[in-house]
């Protein structure tokens, strides 16, 4: 009798394996369709590949209430086939569920190297369950061996809306983190993934890209420098990138492109480095360029104003009016000044005619 049962298990497993490894276009075993979901966290790509069984299986009908603890076993069990005598659930159906990470991440606060791992779930009846990251070369749980485990992290089941097909996804997305989850029937299991050095990873990829085709465009050098300035990282190299955008050779040209925009980026890098005086020198040059239009100067003045430097912003607004007295952004500039004039000296200055922005233009600044 034992021999007969073992033979059935072997034949069933062999048939399933043959179906899943065949290159023929045939339905998957057990109607568990292959599925894959990917999510980017900054420059890091995370992909989960799995087979998705359903609650209402065509062969066994409604399995609601019989998934967790029955179809999905608690703890570790002997699969009755393969090399292992004690294995967790494969967190899906048929082949092993796998998770692929393009870069190093943290999972539940623990380090996990880039690569592809088999993803198992140790379902516990009481207390936390555990996600297990292990080698991915096995099939299902049949070749599971704990000596190849790379990481185990706890997870608690949560009640969730009914989900017919076992589904992986991502939510709670942030620029440097996301939560992966498994949902099936009325349960959800989560997995927090963090990329703590996301800005540094961006810089590394940008640096690599600038050695290729993007390095032929001054705009990409400028974008790279601006990213570093905005995030206050890699500033010494960012200053080199900003200079290349201004004066570097591109596509046979002898110099880059010196205009208001590229000079403003260089000034932003210098400002992030704490070199405000040097940044001001660069912007003085930018203001004198023929292409320095009223909108560009106005936007820059607003940026300075938002940084809390009211006096400096006021001087830039005045400069804009001197350079472009007939520009339609005049009223916007006047109103912006008025809303931000708070001290007695500022009110005194605002009540005068600032190149067409005062009472003579119908804009009584202190009262707007």
Label every PLM stretch briefly.
Residues 1-5:
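Positively charged n-region of N-terminal signal peptides that target proteins for export
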Residues 16-20:
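Boundary at the C-terminal end of the N-terminal hydrophobic targeting segment
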Residues 21-51, 57-58:
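Early extracytoplasmic/domain-onset interaction patches
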Residues 49-114, 120-220:
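Extended, well-structured beta-strand/loop surface patches
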Residues 219-325, 329, 333:
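Alpha-helical adaptor scaffolds
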Residues 246, 287-288, 318, 322, ...:
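TPR/TPR-like (Sel1-like) alpha-helical repeat modules
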């Amino acid at each position: 009798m034992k021999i007969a049962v073992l033979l059935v298990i072997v034949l069933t497993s062999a048939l399933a394996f043959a179906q899943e490894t065949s290159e023929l276009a045939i339905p998957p075993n057990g109607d568990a369709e292959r599925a894959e979901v990917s999510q980017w966290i900054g420059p890091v790509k995370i992909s989960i590949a799995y087979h998705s069984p359903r609650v209402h299986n065509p062969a066994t009908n409604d399995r609601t209430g019989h998934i967790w603890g029955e179809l999905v076993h608690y703890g570790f069990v002997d699969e009755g086939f393969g090399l292992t005598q004690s294995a967790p659930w494969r967190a899906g159906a048929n082949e092993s569920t796998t998770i692929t990470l393009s870069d190093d991440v943290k999972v539940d606060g623990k380090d996990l190297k880039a690569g592809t791992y088999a993803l198992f779930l140790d379902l516990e009846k009481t207390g936390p369950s555990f996600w297990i990251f292990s080698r991915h070369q096995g099939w299902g749980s049949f070749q599971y061996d704990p000596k190849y485990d790379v990481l185990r992290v706890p997870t608690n089941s949560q009640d969730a809306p009914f989900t017919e097909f076992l589904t992986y996804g991502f939510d709670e997305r942030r620029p440097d983190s996301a939560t992966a989850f498994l949902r099936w029937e009325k349960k959800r299991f989560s997995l927090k993934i963090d990329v703590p050095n996301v800005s540094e990873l961006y810089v590394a990829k940008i640096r690599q890209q600038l050695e290729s085709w993007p390095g032929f465009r001054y705009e990409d050098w400028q974008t790279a420098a601006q990213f570093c300035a905005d995030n206050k990282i890699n500033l010494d190299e960012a200053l080199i990138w900003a200079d290349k955008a201004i004066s570097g050779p591109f596509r046979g040209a002898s110099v880059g492109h010196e205009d208001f925009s590229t000079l403003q980026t260089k000034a932003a890098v210098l400002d992030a480095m704490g070199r405000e005086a040097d940044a001001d020198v660069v912007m003085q040059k930018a203001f004198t360029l023929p292409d320095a239009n009223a909108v560009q100067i106005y936007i820059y003045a607003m940026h300075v104003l938002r940084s809390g430097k009211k006096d400096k912003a006021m001087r830039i607004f005045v400069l804009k009016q001197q350079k472009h007295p007939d520009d339609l952004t005049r009223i916007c500039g006047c109103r912006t000044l008025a809303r931000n004039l708070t001290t007695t000296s500022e009110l005194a200055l605002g009540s005068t005619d600032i190149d067409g922005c005062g009472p003579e233009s119908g804009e009584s600044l202190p009262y707007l």
